[in-house]
């Protein structure tokens, strides 16, 4: 099997720019051809998950997120079904609130089966 594509995927967004407008860091940059480029240097999701620095750039707004950022995803019409299906319930929210004050051992144990375990404890504390 080869990685060949005969027809490029069409931009199904049309004139919708909800994601561009929702991004707190304006990281979706317009290109001359009408497409957009995600400038990860501005993206809160990149910084809260992948950036291992002790501090985050001052210009990056986290908009209440300590892990990732879903502002663009939450407004996308393509994601409406997924967004309503995977919303946090009160139990999930309570567990995350408890982690805010957790020590490192508790954090590691509580997140071992979660996507949240991708970040180090120091990043978790930095991002709050």
Regions found by a protein language model. Give the residues of each.
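Residue-level signal for the nucleotide or nucleotide-sugar donor/cofactor binding architecture
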Residues: 14, 67, 119, 123
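Short, solvent-exposed segments of well-ordered alpha helices
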Residues: 7, 60-63, 115-119
């Amino acid at each position: 099997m080869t990685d060949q594509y005969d027809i490029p995927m069409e931009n199904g967004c049309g004139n919708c720019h909800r994601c561009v407008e929702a991004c707190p860091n304006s990281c979706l940059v317009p290109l001359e051809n009408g497409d957009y480029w995600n400038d990860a240097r501005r993206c809160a999701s990149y910084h809260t998950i992948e950036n291992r620095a002790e501090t985050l750039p001052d210009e990056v707004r986290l908009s209440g997120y300590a892990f990732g950022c879903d502002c663009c995803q939450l407004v996308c019409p393509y994601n409406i079904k997924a967004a309503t299906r995977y919303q946090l319930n009160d139990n999930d929210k309570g567990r995350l609130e408890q982690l805010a004050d957790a020590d490192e051992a508790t954090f590691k144990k509580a997140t071992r089966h979660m996507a949240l375990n991708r970040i180090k404890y120091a990043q978790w504390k930095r991002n709050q």
